[in-house]
C-alpha cells in the first residue's frame, strides 16, 4: 500500500517516522510532502527510503492512502489542489 503524507512538519513527520519504523509498511512505500525543503531533507536523513517531494499532486496521484497533516486552515486548499487525481478507492485521512 502506497501512503502519501501531505505536510511533513511536526505531526506529519512523526506519522511518517512511526510508519517507517513499524512492520506494516515499508519506508519505500511512503511519500511525504512539505513546503519546507529543510523539513523534507531532515526526514530523508533519518529514513533515506522515504520518498520526498514538494508536489502534493504528484504525491496524491501515486497513493492508495493520503494523510493530510496540515494546519486546519490549509485543508480546503490541499483538497482543491489534489482533487483532480482523487479516486473513490483512495482513503483520505
Residue ranges and their predicted role:
Residues 1-54, 58-62:
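NAD(P)+-binding Rossmann beta1-loop-alpha1 motif at the extreme N-terminus of oxidoreductases
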Residues 51-93:
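Rossmann-fold NAD(P) dinucleotide-binding segment
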